[in-house]
Amino acid sequence: MKRIFLLIVTNLAVLLVASIVMSILGVNTSTMGGLLVFAAIFGFGGAFISLAISKWMAKKTMGCEVITTPRDSTERWLLDTVARQAQQAGIKMPEVAIYQSPEMNAFATGPSKDNSLVAVSTGLLYGMSQDEIEGVLAHEVSHVANGDMVTLTLIQGVVNTFVIFAARVVAGIINNFVSSNDEEGEGLGMFAYMAVVFVLDMLFGILASIIVAYFSRIREYRADEGAARLAGKNKMIAALERLRQGPESSAMPAQMSAFGINGKRSMAELMMSHPPLEKRIAALQSR
């Protein structure tokens, strides 16, 4: 209940701040053009702010320890492997980090190909063979080389803009309908209008999540293919087979999970950021 209350308060606060900012900028959101500008600024703005702080956020939320000076042979091997793969992929050496987690997972993040982070869990680092880890690292390096962080940010910006725009257009239609059937012609009123916008934001947000998840799954297949080129198909398949034997990924926030090696499983594949491991293995075997 507390989480729902905080979500509602946060959404209302965002709407209030957005309205104040757009008023200062002189954008008239009562027109379609003004509303579209409003939606684009906040839709893309939020997505790109998330991208800009993605490395910092990952380090803070996951407790990542960036390897500057290797403490043992395992960390030295980890750095050398990422450096070799980054050179093969034609990108600048990412920062390499380790975070404490018993689950086997890894992720890549960062605002650009030349400013990225590859992080692995302790569960993966000490629970997989070196060949399997090499496949995982190649997958994450491929995410960076393919520019997946920027690509999905652009997609997120587009769907954010759609959600903000569509929710307010539909809320306006509902408000006009209520106003035309109201003797006083007052419509919904401010609080009722904001409540309608909130509900529509949630509904359209679910649709937007399906679209983003679809593109995320496509990028996962591409990262698997890239990993097969960098580390070899057999190592990538071995890594996925090992992940299939393990428990479901659960500890990673959604923003990092989208670029992880092992995503959360879902009853509805439409909502999954990663294809099922079985399908990924089959796709590699058919290459």
From Swiss-Prot:
Zn(2+) binds at H139, H143, E220. This is Protease HtpX. The lineage of its organism: Bacteria, Pseudomonadati, Pseudomonadota, Gammaproteobacteria, Alteromonadales. GO terms for biological process: proteolysis. It comes from the Bacteria. Belongs to the peptidase M48B family. It is an enzyme of class 3 (hydrolase). InterPro entries: HtpX_protease, Pept_M48_protease_HtpX, Peptidase_M48. Its EC number is 3.4.24.-. The chain crosses the membrane at residues 4-24, 33-53, 154-174, 195-215. It is found in: Cell inner membrane. Its cofactor is Zn(2+). Binds 1 zinc ion per subunit.
